[in-house]
Amino acid sequence: MKINTALILCAGFGKRLNPLTLDIPKPLIELNNVSVLETCINLIESLDVKEIFINTFYLKDQIRNFINKKNFKPKISIIDDGKNILDTGGGIKNMLNHTKEDDVLIFNPDTIWKKNYSKEIIEMEKLYFSKQLKNILLLVNKDLSFDKNLNGNF
């Protein structure tokens, strides 16, 4: 990969998953004994990305402790959103202030990222650079998603 930096959005309250998220941040919810955050980091690691920034707000100490206990290959920096939640755009802007990179991958750990998504991300990166795009968004057809039977604003 040409892109060496990834941002992971982990600051939200996880209200849609209450009561599960009353005591644990949504990125640390586990499926098959692996948190969705770890699944996301494993995908990023498989892409050979060198540095990851994770923004935090709600139950941020749990995310920091989780990262500190693991031995992930990429350098991981935790960015605190401060006294007020910055929402998606503000969180991204805040994290971008911590890197000199112009090209970054942005991940939402709400999505269950499997390693087999790396093919799509690599193809997306090729298109991004070949067409000299300013940004590009990866979407998955809802019929192919894991949550196609769930209702909600997500």
Describe each region flagged by the PLM.
Residues 4-20:
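A phosphate-binding catalytic loop at a beta-strand-loop-alpha-helix junction
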Residues 114-154:
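Conserved core of the sugar-phosphate nucleotidyltransferase
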